[in-house]
Amino acid sequence: GLIGSPVATYAAAPVAVAKTVVADEYDPHPQYQYGYDVQDGLTGDSKSQIESRSGDVVQGSYSLVDPDGTRRTVEYTADPINGFNAVVHREPLVAKAVVAAHAPVVHAAPVAKIAHF
């Protein structure tokens, strides 16, 4: 008997694959702009944002109503020289409650005692 059986081997020849390399388009002066505005009277959601880019400079602003009823507006710019800079404005939307004068104290009328026979 045979102790080891012969093993057939096969080596495939390398296949040449042509790859097409497509360079990503590079825009040396990219530009965009967008914005949105949400005013939902049912939920009270109130927010907006606008932003634009021209080359390496991005500028914009966003606005929202904080839980304390103050509108916060942030205006910002960003560029490679100055980095990101923002200015925050806060504007009260709800007038402060006026302290009411004390109402007169009302006393309960005395309870009449009824005699039962």
Curated annotation (Swiss-Prot):
Domain of life: Eukaryota
Keywords per UniProt: Cuticle, Repeat
Gene Ontology CC terms: extracellular matrix; extracellular space
PROSITE patterns the UniProt entry points to: CHIT_BIND_RR_1, CHIT_BIND_RR_2
Domain Chitin-binding type R&R stretches: 29-95
Sequence repeats, residue ranges: 12-15, 108-111
Single annotated GO MF: structural constituent of cuticle
PANTHER family from the UniProt entry: CCP84AA-RELATED, STRUCTURAL CONTITUENT OF CUTICLE
Record remark: domains: The tetrapeptide (A-A-P-[AV]) repeats found throughout the protein are also present in many proteins constituting the protective envelope of other species.
Reported function: Component of the cuticle of the larva of Tenebrio molitor.
Identification of the protein by name: Larval cuticle protein A2B
Organism: Tenebrio molitor
